[in-house]
Amino acid sequence: KFAEEVADLSDGKMKIQVYANSTLGGDRDLLETCSDGDIPFVVQNTAPQVTFLPDTAVFDLPSAFTTIQQARAAVDNEEFYQKMEKVYQKGGYKLLGYADQGFRVMSTNKNVKSINDFKGQKIRTMENSYHLKFWKTLGANPTPMTFSEVYIGLQQGTIDAQENPYEVIVSSKLYEQQDYVVETNHLPHYISLIVSDEFYNLSLIHISEPTRHLRI
């Protein structure tokens, strides 16, 4: 839908070709290739960005919000957004906006009735030191893993659990390998829309040139 809107609003001057489900690489690969300009546009969860943009750790504070409306209001705050624009710009990116997929929840094959039930569970997390510390604090055994490996990891028993928003759990059919969902709601699943800063500036200059094709 986004690609269609861009083509329509630019009168066909810009066309986006979408590559979903890590087709163009993992989270780290996407950030590096976006910075280099090979993939000019990336739609990505904020969590993997902390390695390249340390100040994005502000999104990794667990249990900061009780409702998704509070979480959305936080990133919509004009002063906050302007500060984050500078963070991305310093890293060589242009921030176009934020979206979300609701809160992240935990799916598992063990019925979690108390905090003690987290102990020892091998849970897949993203490659983010703050996420790892959170789950270790609960007594779990967090394991960083690229998302494309999660389904087979659950299937083969490499991991016992994972955490994602409901939309991701359903669309990827992770429920086929899990018995329970625990509404931890520990973090909002923020999505950032970024382009390389160089590409953004060039696009402003050359938008009147023949149709441009983008990969995201």
Q: For each predicted feature, which ranges?
A:
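N-terminal secretory/targeting leader peptides
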Residues: 1-71, 79, 84-208, 212-215
